[in-house]
Every structure is written in structure tokens, then in C-alpha cells.
Amino acid sequence: MNLRSVFTVEQQRILQRYYENGMTNQSKNCFQLILQCAQETKLDFSVVRTWVGNKRRKMSSKSCESGAAGTVSGTSLAAPDITVRNVVNIARPSSQQSSWTSANNDVIVTGIYSPVSSSSKQGTTKHTNTQITEAHKIPIQKAANKNDTELQLHIPVQRQVAHCKNASVLLGEKTIILSRQTSVLNAGNSVYNHTKKSYGSSPVQASEMTVPQKPSVCQRPCKIEPVGIQRSYKPEHAGLASHNLCGQKPTIRDPCCRTQNLEIREVFSLAVSDYPQRILGGNSTQKPASAEGTCLSIAMETGDAEDEYAREEELASMGAQITSYSRFYESGNSLRAENQSTNLPGPGRNLPNSQMVNIRDLSDNVLYQTRDYHLTPRTSLHTASSTMYSNTNPSRSNFSPHFVSSNQLRLSQNQNNYQISGNLSVPWITGCSRKRALQDRTQFSDRDLATLKKYWDNGMTSLGSVCREKIEAVAIELNVDCEIVRTWIGNRRRKYRLMGIEVPPPRGGPADFSEQPESGSLSALTPGEEAGPEVGEDNDRNDEVSICLSEASSQEESNELIPNETRAHKDEEHQAVSADNVKIEIIDDEESDMISNSEVEQENSLLDYKNEEVRFIENELEIQKQKYFKLQSFVRNLILAMKADDKDQQQALLSDLPPELEEMDCSHASPDPDDTSLSVSSLSEKNASDSL
């Protein structure tokens, strides 16, 4: 039982800061952050990892309570944002409406908006103790008779704010981490939003969007509207100011020009997106939020505390394909909304020629700018369709023509619920790296373990080519990658070696469960005697190969894959070829069984014979004991008669000698009677002294 860890105030502050900067789950994507945090706090790695898990559960339980009060509102907003540590920059041309929701439920911001007098917030425009990061201006081709606008969020860097909760907001293709404050904020730490929106012909006046001084009960909740329904904004209720996309910085207007401002009290995020980059200028159809999106998502998971750990084990191995600081998410309902991009009528919505800005072209904030990452469509991680920046219509994108269209990539049916969570702060976990750091654990069910052990008993005990057919067969049966099966075999071999158990020799060919696996394991080596040393060398070599294969790149795995049709034909051929071998093995098994049975019978007969000998010796011992007692009584009586000098008694005893003495006298006649009498007399004296 582990003891509870007591953290100091400084350690709590460091842990909270790392949590805000992306250390939000226990997978390998946060391994570097957890390691750095452990070194900085001088705590053990497992202690920090346990703290992250406890933090996730606490935030998930709180989000379930607070998520029920939130309402779903808004339409679509597409923004490829760049997540840089401690700084969030958003720059996106958008002429849609000003709600915080993207096309495929990427971001559903539910908030409590209350009017606040603008005079009380004038002091917040000074930016005294804050660092406001300005987003990059992205030039976009303008369509005729259309207004292109730019949305800019200026979010201050707050490094030492106690008790912050992260609300992850997905906008477009990347992830923005907004901090939801529960402590009192000063006037300088404010979030400013200045844009310029033009809906039809009526401009929207400038206003200010600030974080409240203190969390309080809402005074006027926002209007509840279903997702996907266009909402007309009146000028007096709009909270977004704007400026043209000409490269100039946004002008902060006097907030006194407005009678009231909007104040954000709560920000929630529902991570139920599939392909955020498919949002082209807001021309998309949104579906109502499903039941999965009722909880706040912490660290880009489903928000379901019961299913969290099971999903994390499945998702951890997929993070190796993401090539920058990003988090992508997908769920089963997002696959149903893949190709439903339509044009919705409405003011500011008709932008058929709006372009997709690829995240790779923003060179100031993207890591690994000089490298070009090409991902293979078929990898063992099954994440090609969710890790590529693909577009629904390739002709609309002039920035990334080499990326594969999302129409060409599909997830298989058994991978609908797979999600990807990745914060790649280290370059060796990228998709093009030679090795994958920190191979994650695979949790098998009881049925899968029984299947693996059944194949193990049938001869799938080697990592070499001799067991390739069995490995492929069990991988297809369990619907897992061959590398996972090879890793399991290598781990089991090491376990056997550590426990002192001899690893069974491997058997080639397809698996055959018509016989007992133990009986065929020894006879599989009899057809070729020279196969013995090769198998031994293969066993020694496999222990090293098991480690290498578990870290091999996905490109090497894809080269080893065999199509199912050719694999089926190959299995049939091997079954036809190895039929004679199976018969020979059965005959050898019968002979070995006969030999073993005869040996057992021989040992049993030998044991019975030994038992008879023991019983015979025991009977002989009893007979000898009786003879000894008779001789002892005869000698005693004879000695007493000799001492009493009773001739008659002596003659009577000598006339009635025991038969043993008579036989002894006849067979052992002493040539010297004096010696015999002397020996008898000495024996009688000794017995007499013993009796006295």
C-alpha cells in the first residue's frame, strides 16, 4: 500500500504549472514533461505520475458536475491555431458568426454571459503586468463581394496563478489551452478580444471581453440554442470588435462607446472532433451534440472516468504519428459527419473560395519547419487518417498538395472509438523517428490471453520466421498488430527464463489444435537433425530481436505485412505440404507413448519385486529371532546344569538338542574337541554373567 505524498507549496505550484502547460495525462506523450517536473520538484517519477492521474480524476469529476449546467450554443468557427508553451496565438480569417463552435463539434463553448458596465473595466486596457501575444496575420485570397475578417485573441501569459483549471478548446486543426481561473484575478490579467465583424451591411461596434474579477453566480445566462441553427446577432449584444485583414494591428477602442460588455464566466470544451480541417470558410453542416459531449473533456479524453484508463492504453501508442504540439481527437460519431459539408445561406456565410491555411505554413510557431513529414497510409498504429492534415476537397487547398485527401483514408470498423492524445515536446517521438520511445502496455482480455496461450502451447514460442504463420494467424484472430503478438512472445520467453522454466521449442507451419500440444513439441524436431542447433541459435537470437521489434518503426512493419488473400493461399499450401509431417509426428508420438508406458510398467514390476524381497527378509528375520530365543534358553539351562554339576540334567539337555545345533555339529565337526569345549564354556560363562 503506497503512502500519501505531502507536497510543499513550491512543489504544488510547480506541479500546477506543468499541468497547465500540457502535463495532463499519464501516457508517453507527457513522459518528458513528467520527467522534467520530477527533476524540478525533486520528487519520484511515479509520484508525479500518480499526481497527474489524481488530478485528471478530480477534474473529470468536477467537470461532470459543472458540465450539466452548461448549454450548447453557436454555429461554426474554423481556426487553425498554434499551441506554443505558455503562449497561445490564434489567427484565422473568418466571416462566419462569432460563436465558438466549429463544424464537427470541434469546440462547443458553453458559457454564462452577464452584462458588466464598461466603466468598471476601463482599467483593464492598460496591460500593465501582462504579456499579450499578437497572432500572425494570415493573408487570404478575397472573394468578390465578400468581407474577410480576422479574429485575434490576446491571451496573457500567467505562470504563477494558483489553482487554475485547464479547459482545452479545439479550434480548427490544433488545440488551444485556456485557463479557467478560480482565484481572484487582478485587473491586468485580462483576456482581450478585438475583431471587426460585418454581417450584411450593419457593422458591429467595438467591445471588450474580459475575464471576471471573481467567479460569481450568473446574472443573465446566455440564450440556449441548438447547434447548427443560425443565430442573428444584434449590435447591442455583440461582443466582438474587428479590424480589416491588411496587416495592421487591432486598434483598441474606448470601451465607453458601448453601454455594456460581455463577460466570460465559464469556458468548456467538448473534444468530439474528427477532421477539423474540413471546415472551409464555415460551409459546413453541424449535427447536434451527442450524449458523449455532455462532460467536460480533461486532457483530450472522452470525459468518461470509467473508460478513461482503458482508452488511454489504446491511445498512447498512436501519439507517435503527430508531428507538432497538437492534440487530435476523434470518436465514433465524428465518422458519420465526414462528407456533409454544405453551404448554409445567411449573412457572412457564403465564402466558397475561402482557403484552408495549413498549419505547416505558419513558420513562426510550428516546430520542425524544415522537415517534411510523409506518413504512410498503412501503418501498424492505424492512425494515418487522423494524423494527416487532409482536406475534403484537395482543389481548395493550395498550401499542402502532397497531403492525402481524407476521402481516401478511412478508419476500420473496429477503430471507431480510437482517439489520439499527443503533446510532442520531444523530437524522438515523431512519426519519422527510427524508434518509438516508451513502448506502451497492451491489456489483453481473458479470452485473448487464452488464445495466445493456446498458440504458445502449439509451438508459437519463437520470434523468428519459423512461427510467422502462427503469429499472423493469432494477430488476425485477435485483430491486433503482429508486433504486439511478438512483444507478448518475447515477454513470455523472458518470464520463462527468469522463472527457470525451459522455453518449449518452436514448431513451424500453421497451428494445428487437433492434438495435444505437449505431445507434438518434442517430435517436431525429429525430421531434420540439423535443425536442432539452428533452433537453439534462433532462440538465443530471438531474445534480442524481441526488444528490437517492439521498437521498430511503422515503415518496417508495413513492409512485413502480407495481404489476407495471399496469406490464405499460403496457409492452404502449408497445410497441404505439412500434412505428411503431421502424420509422422502422430506416429512418433504413439511410439514415445508406448516407450514411456513400457518403462512405467517395468518400473512398477521392479518395485513389486523389491517389495516381495522386503517381505521375505522380514519373515526370515522373524524365524531367526525364534531360533535365537530357543538357543538362548537351551544354553542358559545347560550352563545352570553344569554349574550345579547335575549330570542327569546335562545328559537330558544334550539328548534333546535343537535341530540347528545338530545340523551345526554335523556340518561343522571340529577336529579339535578341546577347542570346542573351551569355546562353549567361555560362551556359557559370558551368558551367565550377563544373566546375573
Swiss-Prot record:
Cellular component GO terms held in the UniProt record: nucleus
Domain of life: Eukaryota
Residue ranges for the DNA-binding region feature of this UniProt entry: 3-63, 437-500
Single Gene Ontology MF annotation: DNA binding
Primary location recorded for the protein, binned into one broad class: nucleus
Key word Nucleotide-binding present: no
Subcellular locations according to the entry: Nucleus
Keyword field: DNA-binding, Homeobox, Isopeptide bond, Nucleus, Repeat, Ubl conjugation
Glycyl lysine isopeptide (Lys-Gly) (interchain with G-Cter in SUMO2) cross-link site: K137, K142, K146, K165, K174, K196, K214, K223, K234
Region (Disordered): 117-136, 505-541, 647-692
Record field: compositional bias (Polar residues): 117-133, 676-692
Gene3D superfamilies to which the protein is assigned, alphabetical: Homeodomain-like
Protein's name according to its UniProt entry: Highly divergent homeobox
Species assigned in the record: Mus musculus
